[in-house]
């Protein structure tokens, strides 16, 4: 990756929070991916990264739906502040 395309760690984390908000608002990795212009696989990887960073699941995953967990619910106001 060349320097003009490199993201700072802070920027990367803001992107992860924006993706988190998109998944929470749409309830879907696929629809969130469309909103943030990424592949569904990239969105899933970002959510797994976020969960590793905070040490807890942020979503309850069910067939066809993503619902905020208690940890995700607590994270949401902070995510909105940083986006």
Enumerate the language-model features and the residues they cover.
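The N-cap/first-turn positions of alpha helices
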Residues: 13-16, 40, 72, 79
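Alpha-helical residues within the helix-turn-helix
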Residues: 34, 52, 73
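A detector for short, charged/polar N-terminal pre-domain segments
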Residues: 1-12, 18
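Short helix-boundary/capping micro-motifs
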Residues: 21-37
């Amino acid at each position: 990756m060349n320097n003009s395309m490199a993201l700072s760690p802070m920027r990367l984390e803001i992107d992860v929070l924006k993706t988190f908000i998109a998944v929470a608002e749409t309830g879907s990795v696929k629809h969130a991916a469309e909103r943030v212009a990424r592949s569904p696989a990239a969105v899933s990887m970002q959510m797994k990264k976020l969960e590793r960073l905070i040490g807890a699941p942020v979503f309850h995953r069910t067939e066809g739906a993503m619902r905020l967990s208690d940890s995700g619910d607590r994270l949401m106001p902070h995510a909105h502040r940083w986006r």
